[in-house]
Amino acid sequence: MAWLKYHAGDFAQSQSYCQRVEDILVKCPTGSSGSLLPEVYGEQAWTYLKLSKSYYLKAVESFRKALEIQTDDIESNAGYAIALFRTEEWVLENLEENEEPPSIKQLHSALELNPDDAVLQSMLAVKLAAYKKYEEAEGLLKKALKTDPDNPHVSRYVGKYFRNHHQLDESIDMLERALKRATQSSFIHHQLALCYMRKKIAEQSRKPFSSQREVRYWRRRCIRELEMAVKIKPTFHLAWADLALLYAEERNFRRAEEIFQQCLLKLPEYDESLSQAIHQRYGDFHYHHKRNEAQAIVHYTKGLLIPLKKYEKKVCAKKLKKIAEKRLSRNPGDGEALALLGQVARAEGNRKEAAEFYEKGLNCDKDNEEYLSALCELRLDLH
């Protein structure tokens, strides 16, 4: 019911049903009704997984509880693998270098129980390729396409695999075919838009030989797919932010600004991953399109300080460094620019370097309490 209410747009009722499931779990501890518990945990987990991105970690926990009771359940094993696959970008910080993430192990386990699940095969292929296990990944892709070639979920992951490996034409072909079978998939529309965006960027990078006509062509195709994605799923904030940047490229700054303000207003609580991505893109809007360095710094800094090691964090750090270094090239005594470099170094874990930057910043602005406070904290950490 939670799932149905969510898709009917009745979010309050959807949340209410989720809470009722949790209440059932409290009333039915592990020692009672053993045959019911795994099903209840499983239903709760699938509901969380289908609600929104901000519930994925709860889905992981519910699937884990279901599997503690019924370890060989095919659906719970598959669901746990999918949930891990979707949440891993938030939880990989503690992995050793070259250590495989939990999703790879769980996808293998799920496929042992259901070896012909083409969706799981295609998901595992995407994940293995990210860890340079190309031979096994390609073998799984072939199996998935042979087992269930018309499944749009298979097509979208195969398309993602090709896009990640810069095989854009193959990815576009796969996603366009998937879209014919699943016209209302906001995810596939978004994936297709990302491919078109790569095409646009590739054409732009051919300067001075790039064709503005080609750039406009790919931009318009990208905009069309993103507009479809957000029409189908109005809560698709990341697609909205990508769309806003494209509107800005077309110099529709007012519409872009409206979209970013709406994204920030409607951001789900505790969704740090999405928040980081929105602030990075909003920073790009101010930096590249509005030429508003001060506002760009505000949003890049917000993205930087969110404690997730994602691509967007690296972009925020890189842009802040670029801004600070440019200012220092004009004025070596710019205390704010030095403090900005200190903030970036600190966020990246380079405490000694951060302390040095803040110390230099204080030499330029001796009464700045913010720099002094940061320097004191860093020195305490270092000793």
Ranges and model annotations:
Residues A8, L51-K53, T87, Y131, ...:
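Structural motif corresponding to the intra-repeat A-B loop/turn of tetratricopeptide repeats
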Residues I24-L37, S76, H108-N114, E227-K231, ...:
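Flexible helix-coil transition and linker loops at the boundaries of alpha-helical arrays
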Residues M1, H7, L36-E39, E43, ...:
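"A position-specific structural signal for the A-helix of alpha-solenoid helical repeats
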